[in-house]
Amino acid sequence: MASFVAGQQGKEPAFESYPVRVESKTARAIDFRNSPGASKFRTRLREAIKGDVNFAGRYIISGWGCGSGCSQMAIIDAKTGRVFMPDALAGVSAWYYDVEDDYEVYTYKKNSRLLVVRGAPGPMTDGDTEQEPGSYYYEWRPNRLRLIKFVPRPKPKNA
């Protein structure tokens, strides 16, 4: 699947191509009972649920560091309080060379199902991921991320 996605040609996916209606938040607390793994991040998730919807119409994305050059994220359903922790967000190793000044590891919008991750996503093993660094374009489907395109990182100018 990854080689198929990496081999796709054409423009990078646009947020406007994945529209969604923004709903109001109704959850007041995190549903730890139905959110495997979420209890390890209680403080961060409890703070996040206090905020407004910021992704895919009814979700709140929250993130935290997991070491030098590493970050993790969770997606909270703002209607139910349930937390989703996709493997792709369980330790993104960021890359920093040959990128624009306004570089962001994660890019998302509250009115779009598109999530862009720049780095090497996936669970960290021995301080590294098995994924190739680059820009990963995911579509949020009910309760999961679907990889729709991968663009390898640019080679360093000095290489």
Go through each PLM region and give its residues:
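Structural signature of eukaryotic scaffold interfaces centered on beta-propeller domains
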Residues: 48-54, 102-111
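Short beta-strand elements that form the blades of beta-propeller/WD-repeat-like
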Residues: 57-64, 113-119
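Short, surface-exposed coil-to-beta transition loops
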Residues: 68-73, 99-103, 131-134
